[in-house]
Amino acid sequence: MAFKKSLVFAALLLAGCDDTLTLNQVCSETPGFCEDLNKDSHCKDERALLIYARYHEYKSPTDENKYDLLQNLESYNRCVSRAAKIEHIKLKEKTTSRVEGHLTALKEMTRIYNETKGSNHPGLLYYHWSRNSDSTAMNKLLNMQDDPRVQNDPEIQLFLAEFYAKVDDDKTVDILYRVLELNKRGHTPNPEVYSSLVSIFYKHEKYKHAYTFARVAQLSGVEDIDIIPVTNQLASMGKDLANLDSLAQRTYESIQAGEFVSPRDF
């Protein structure tokens, strides 16, 4: 339910300054942005967000709007491609419209990729590298690491962490700490931040670090963190977990308050 509420809120933001803009108005003004998507109730929220994103990219085809559209296309496509596999026994046209929506998403993603090949937008650069194996795009992004658009964007920082995770664990940890520093009050970081930190620390036998962030992950509601191996390691070393539990609680609270500071000498 919380996810759906966030989607609706995002849709309102996409509507921009004109808070009277409704989905029906968009579809009436630009029916082509609605008619080539699925017609049934599947992926309702993703479909609505995509329609708004298409409209705003059409009205103002900036790199930022193209990036937003690309993200919404991928989100919608993930949903509708799954839904397209659900066969309607009585209503074959529903399955057909889902396939149409899937094909529309693929076509539009190809268009955005082609139109943004020369872009310097950090998000688009990462997409070109991760989706199309464009090493030139990734090199551009790596050369922009001191750019405020990169340094102050938690999503882009997480992209960089995913890249460095393959080649440099120390750099990856620094970037993941930066993601936590950028976390806004009341927000919960992407669970991948915690799972990556736990994995790296465990690999390097920094068990206290691994345990602390595994507990932070649990406090944040992350369910797929396996804390048992690191707990067993610490128990075999005779370590008292109470102090680490307290540290984890303080760390969690600082992250949730938007006040986390990278523990350089952790």
Regions found by a protein language model. Give the residues of each.
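Terminal, low-structured helical/coil segments at or just beyond the last alpha-helical repeat
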Residues: 226-266
